[in-house]
């Protein structure tokens, strides 16, 4: 445990594989390790453009919808948190070191799947981002989800519990096959696709629970509880396999140990533990919330009606 806690005290951005030359000497420097602060490479320029575009679209969308009843403060808070986390894990310190430390990479992926995706769904963020685009593009983006369009019909199918769960599990296991995991590590294009697929499939996973527009969920609370229990099992099994495998599975052994804290096997073990425990705690929290809602619902229906 002390090895993990000492990580931030032994960082060395000077040795980072992306060509950065600034030394890092602890938590403060870790928090300053943002990709777009290092625009001496094409990746740094792309990162800066990516962050700027997302923030601009969001702010324009909020401005255009500010005089409507759609913008609820609680929704804006959820979207803002999700957007900050998205930028932090994809462009900030987490991404900066994710390609060299497996357990940090796992933190990145878990944040995308079990935090950011459900936050965006809970806030029904899509309309704000659509309204942040130019008029012609806005019309093009909104048409596929209106009326009985083909896109809406497809969405209604893939968000059904049996399909959303299956697609999520297939995607999760696919990207943890060593060949494809290592491919994403080695090539930025595949890594980008990897992150997009994680977020998209995670949204499908959470859709039957949260059910935002344009396709509402029709699951009862007991059905949602069963769904979450089924969903958590495959990810827990994968986490257990990674944790208990012993020998390194992925290509982190080709990366020099810059900080001399964790061996590659220990790094992988901690990554599996992070996937196993914090990841499952999110599902446990959802289950607890659903149980309380179910209990309250049952209590309200079982109370005798008072006669006038």
Model-derived regions, located:
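Alpha-helical membrane segments of multi-pass proteins
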Residues: 2-308
């Amino acid at each position: 445990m002390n090895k993990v806690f000492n990580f931030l005290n032994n960082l060395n951005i000077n040795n980072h594989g992306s060509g950065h030359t600034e030394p890092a000497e602890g938590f403060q420097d870790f928090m300053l390790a943002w990709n777009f602060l290092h625009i001496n490479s094409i990746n740094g320029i792309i990162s800066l453009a990516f962050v700027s575009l997302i923030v601009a679209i969001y702010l324009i969308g909020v401005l255009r919808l500010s005089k409507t009843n759609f913008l609820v403060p609680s929704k804006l808070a959820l979207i803002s948190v999700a957007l900050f986390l998205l930028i932090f894990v994809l462009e900030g310190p987490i991404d900066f070191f994710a390609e060299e430390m497996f357990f940090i990479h796992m933190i990145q992926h878990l944040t995308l799947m079990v935090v950011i995706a459900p936050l965006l769904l809970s806030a029904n963020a899509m309309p704000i981002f659509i309204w942040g685009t130019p008029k012609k593009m806005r019309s093009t983006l909104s048409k596929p989800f209106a009326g009985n369009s083909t896109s809406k019909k497809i969405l209604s199918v893939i968000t059904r519990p049996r399909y959303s769960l299956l697609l999520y599990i297939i995607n999760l296991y696919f990207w943890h096959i060593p060949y494809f995991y290592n491919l994403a590590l080695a090539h930025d294009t595949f890594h980008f696709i990897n992150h997009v697929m994680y977020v998209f499939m995670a949204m499908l996973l959470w859709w039957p629970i949260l059910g935002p527009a344009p396709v509402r969920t029709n699951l009862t609370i007991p059905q949602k509880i069963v769904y979450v229990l089924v969903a958590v099992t495959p990810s827990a099994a994968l986490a257990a396999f990674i944790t208990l495998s012993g020998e390194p599975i992925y290509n982190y052994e080709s990366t020099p140990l810059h900080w001399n804290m964790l061996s590659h096997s220990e790094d992988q073990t901690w990554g599996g533990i992070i996937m196993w425990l914090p990841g499952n705690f999110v599902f446990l929290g959802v289950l607890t919330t659903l149980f309380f809602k179910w209990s309250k619902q049952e209590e309200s229906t079982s109370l005798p009606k008072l006669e006038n």
